[in-house]
C-alpha cells in the first residue's frame, strides 16, 4: 500500500496518464470506423426498451437491439400506458439516416446521435410487445417512475432526481438562454445531498466509516446504472475516487483526483468527451477545485456569489462556442437560483416524491420559475451575440478567466 501511495503521489504521473487517455480517446472517436450493424433493407427490429416518452399522438422509444435505435411511432387509437422499461418489443418500420445540419454553425443532429452510438432512426409502422420486463434494475426504475406519473410536477422530479429531462422544449430553451440549464442536471450538488441523507441514517446504525463509504458507493453505482447521464457520471466517479483516496489514505491531491475522474470517465464512455453537459460540469468543477483555498476563506453568502460568478465566467467560452451568445443577466440569476434550488427546490422534490401531497407546493415553485425564465429569456437587451470562436481561443479564454 505504501508503494502504491508513493506511485500515485508522483508529481506528474496522473497528469501524464490522463493526457495519454485523452489523446487516445480523440484518435479512437475520430478515426475508428464506427458503423451500423443494420442495413437500409432491414425492416424488423427486436430490442429492449431503455427509454420512452409518450405524447398525445406520438411515442418515442429508444431500444437496445443489435445497437441502439431511436424509434418514433404516430398512432391514433392505440395507447402505450402498459409499456415499461425493460420490455422486449418488435418494431416494423423504415430506417432513416439522421439529418445533418444545413448551416455550418448550427446544431448537428446526426453528430449528436452518433456520439450516443445511434446511427439510425426508425419510422415505425407497428410496435408490439413480445415479452414483459424481467430485469431487476428495470423493475426498480419502473416502480420509481410509476409513483410520480400522475403528479403535476413529475417532469421536475424526473429531471432533478432521475436525470430524465422531460421539460418542454420552450422551457429548456429559456433555461439555456438564461444560462441556468446546468442547475437542472443531476450533479455533485445532488450526489452530496443524497450521500448526506444516507449518512444521516447510517450514523444511527454504525460508526464504521468503511461501511458507510461502501454503502454510499454501492448506492451511487446503482443510481448511475439506473439513471445514466454525463454530469452524473462525473459526479459519481469523482465521489467514489474521493472515498477510495480517504479510506486507503493515498493522499492524492484534489486536482489529481479530478484528472483521474476524467480518465476513468473516458474509459467508461469515450464519447462523453463531446457531451456538452459533461464539458460544462467538468470545466466548472475543475476551476472550483483550483479555487478551493479561496472558497474556504469566504462565508456562506460570499461563497454562493463567488461560485455563481466563477461558474458563469468559466462557462462563457463554452457557451459562445456552442450558442454564439451569452446573457449577462445569468450572473444575477445564478446567484439567486443556486441557493433556491439547492436549499428549497431539491429537498422539496425529494419530499414530494416521498409525500405526493406536497405536489401542489412544488408545482407552484417550478411554475413560478418557468414563468420568470420565459419572461427574462425574451429580453434581448441583456444578450450579447458573438461570432463562433476557434477551439484554441475557447481554451485560452478559459485559462485567462482563472488567471
Model features per residue range: what roles?
Residues 47, 93, 160, 187, ...:
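Divalent metal-coordination and catalytic microenvironments
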Residues 129-138, 155-166, 226-232, 250-258, ...:
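Hydrophobic alpha-helical transmembrane segments
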Residues 5-12, 16-20, 122, 172-330, ...:
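Hydrophobic alpha-helical transmembrane segments in multi-pass membrane proteins
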Residues 37-40, 62-65, 144-151, 201-205, ...:
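Alpha-helix C-terminal capping segments
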Residues 2-7, 19-182:
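Membrane-interface helix/helix-cap signal primarily in integral membrane proteins
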Residues 287-390:
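Alpha-helical transmembrane segments of multi-pass integral membrane proteins
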Residues 2-14, 26-38, 51, 55-57, ...:
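C-terminal regulatory/interaction regions
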Amino acid at each position: 500500500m505504501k508503494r502504491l501511495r508513493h506511485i500515485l503521489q508522483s508529481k506528474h504521473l496522473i497528469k501524464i496518464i490522463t493526457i495519454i487517455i485523452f489523446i487516445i480517446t480523440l484518435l479512437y472517436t475520430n478515426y475508428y470506423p464506427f458503423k451500423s450493424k443494420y442495413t437500409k433493407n432491414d425492416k424488423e427490429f427486436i430490442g429492449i426498451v431503455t427509454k420512452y416518452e409518450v405524447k398525445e399522438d406520438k411515442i418515442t422509444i429508444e431500444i437496445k437491439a443489435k445497437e441502439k435505435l431511436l424509434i418514433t411511432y404516430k398512432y391514433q387509437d392505440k395507447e402505450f400506458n402498459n409499456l415499461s422499461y425493460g420490455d422486449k418489443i418488435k418494431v416494423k418500420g423504415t430506417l432513416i439516416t439522421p439529418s445533418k445540419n444545413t448551416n455550418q454553425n448550427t446544431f448537428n443532429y446526426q453528430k449528436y446521435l452518433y456520439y450516443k452510438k445511434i446511427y439510425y432512426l426508425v419510422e415505425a409502422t407497428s410496435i408490439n410487445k413480445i415479452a414483459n420486463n424481467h430485469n431487476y434494475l428495470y423493475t426498480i426504475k419502473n416502480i420509481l417512475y410509476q409513483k410520480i406519473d400522475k403528479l403535476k410536477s413529475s417532469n421536475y422530479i424526473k429531471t432533478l432526481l432521475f436525470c430524465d429531462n422531460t421539460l418542454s422544449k420552450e422551457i429548456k430553451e429559456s433555461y439555456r438562454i438564461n444560462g441556468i440549464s446546468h442547475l437542472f442536471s443531476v450533479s455533485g450538488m445532488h450526489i452530496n445531498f443524497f450521500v448526506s441523507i444516507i449518512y444521516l441514517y447510517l450514523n444511527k446504525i454504525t460508526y464504521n466509516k468503511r461501511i458507510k463509504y461502501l454503502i454510499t458507493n454501492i448506492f451511487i453505482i446503482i443510481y448511475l446504472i439506473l439513471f445514466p447521464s454525463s454530469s452524473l457520471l462525473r459526479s459519481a466517479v469523482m465521489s467514489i475516487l474521493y472515498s477510495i483516496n480517504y479510506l486507503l489514505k493515498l493522499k492524492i491531491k484534489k486536482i489529481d483526483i479530478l484528472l483521474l475522474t476524467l480518465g476513468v470517465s473516458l474509459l467508461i464512455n469515450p464519447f462523453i468527451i463531446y457531451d456538452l453537459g459533461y464539458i460544462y460540469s467538468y470545466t466548472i468543477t475543475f476551476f472550483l477545485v483550483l479555487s478551493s483555498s479561496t472558497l474556504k476563506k469566504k462565508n456562506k453568502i460570499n461563497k454562493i456569489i463567488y461560485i455563481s460568478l466563477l461558474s458563469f465566467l468559466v462557462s462563457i467560452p463554452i457557451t459562445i462556442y456552442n450558442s454564439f451568445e451569452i446573457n449577462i443577466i445569468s450572473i444575477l440569476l445564478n446567484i439567486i437560483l443556486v441557493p433556491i434550488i439547492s436549499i428549497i427546490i431539491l429537498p422539496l422534490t425529494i419530499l414530494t416524491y416521498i409525500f405526493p401531497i406536497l405536489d401542489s407546493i412544488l408545482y407552484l415553485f417550478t411554475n413560478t420559475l418557468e414563468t420568470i425564465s420565459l419572461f427574462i429569456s425574451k429580453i434581448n437587451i441583456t444578450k450579447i451575440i458573438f461570432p463562433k470562436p476557434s477551439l484554441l481561443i475557447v481554451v485560452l479564454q478559459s485559462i485567462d478567466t482563472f488567471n
